[in-house]
């Protein structure tokens, strides 16, 4: 009788390791599900592989893209967005995500002329671009539920003035914070860039630069 009791007790003492592995497995599965859920619905990290958004974003900058805002409100002019390639881009064999700045909202009329961008007849005050655009474009009217996007490095960006508009369903989220490199950590603010404002014409001089037809991938 005593021997049986001892053996049964020994078996009970051996069971916790099995429970430990089971709990560890549950924890890992839960963590993976949470990570996938956060990346799909809340936020994700992206890096910048090209110069098309300079000087705002530099090559190898690391950003957080939040995905909640556009579930609650419409995108706004001046916001930096990440989006999946449009049908026009897929037809040109682009399959990675792009990052650009929203310039034209649904219903806007946009044109680029003599180094300036005009939205609904008003010239944008763009203090964030690398150099004034050295091309002419438009006027075009942005269709419903679509957006016109341009790179801040206007003369070195493969954007809407080449391939058209971005449907809203292609938008993945809004770039709102840079977390690398450390000296440049901070929020990507766009309060001063959102609205088209009338300003005095300025004389821009900039040599034309061939566009860099490389998408902003992961």
Curated annotation (Swiss-Prot):
Highest taxon of the lineage: Bacteria
Signal peptide bounds: none
UniProt keyword annotation of Glycosyltransferase present: no
InterPro entries noted in UniProt: LexA/Signal_pep-like_sf (IPR036286), Pept_S26A_signal_pept_1 (IPR000223), Pept_S26A_signal_pept_1_CS (IPR019758), Pept_S26A_signal_pept_1_Lys-AS (IPR019757), Pept_S26A_signal_pept_1_Ser-AS (IPR019756), Peptidase_S26 (IPR019533)
Catalytic residues as annotated in Swiss-Prot or TrEMBL: 52, 100
Topology within the bilayer: Single-pass type II membrane protein
Compartmental location: Cell membrane
Keywords from the UniProt entry: Cell membrane, Hydrolase, Membrane, Protease, Transmembrane, Transmembrane helix
Periplasmic side: 44-218
A molecular-function term among this protein's GO annotations: serine-type endopeptidase activity
Coiled-coil stretches: none
Any one Gene Ontology BP term: signal peptide processing
CDD domains reported in the protein's UniProt record: S26_SPase_I
Keyword Transit peptide: no
GO CC terms of this entry: plasma membrane
Transmembrane domains' residue ranges: 27-43
PROSITE patterns found in the cross-reference section: SPASE_I_1 (PS00501), SPASE_I_2 (PS00760), SPASE_I_3 (PS00761)
Reactions that this protein is recorded to catalyse: Cleavage of hydrophobic, N-terminal signal or leader sequences from secreted and periplasmic proteins
Cytoplasmic side: 1-26
One Pfam family of this chain: Peptidase_S26
EC number(s) from the headed UniProt entry: 3.4.21.89
NCBIfam families reported for this sequence: sigpep_I_bact
UniProt record similarity statement: Belongs to the peptidase S26 family.
Name used for this protein in its record: Probable signal peptidase I-2
Gene that specifies this protein: lepB2
